[in-house]
Amino acid sequence: MINEERLLKVVLAPHVSEKATLAAEVNNTVVFKVLKDANKEEIKAAVEKLFEVEVNSVRTVNVKGKTKRHGASFGKRKDWKKAYVVLKEGQDIDFAGSEG
């Protein structure tokens, strides 16, 4: 059993992009920004607990931070982890919270 407090910290935010929106419409997949040290089992358990849905599978990607220029100096954005969570048929997560 995974620590409940840890599960609440695993999922940081939904990741919104063209690719994520297309994946949600076509493949019933939701994309999240997650902790870098989170594993697939933790991500699955966290999504099932937080959003009360059934998860079919989880795929993860380590995203490298981009190098950005600020005038003559260079800076770097942080590396982060992205999780593609495939929901079972008939399951849905509504981030907009629409009523009615």
Curated annotation (Swiss-Prot):
One of the early assembly proteins it binds 23S rRNA. One of the proteins that surrounds the polypeptide exit tunnel on the outside of the ribosome. Forms the main docking site for trigger factor binding to the ribosome. Gene3D superfamilies: 3.30.70.330. GO terms for biological process: translation. SUPFAM superfamilies: Ribosomal proteins S24e, L23 and L15e. It comes from Pseudoalteromonas atlantica (strain T6c / ATCC BAA-1087). This is Large ribosomal subunit protein uL23. NCBIfam families: PRK05738.1-1, PRK05738.1-3, PRK05738.2-4. GO terms for molecular function: rRNA binding; structural constituent of ribosome. One of its GO terms (cellular component) is ribosome. Pfam families: Ribosomal_L23.
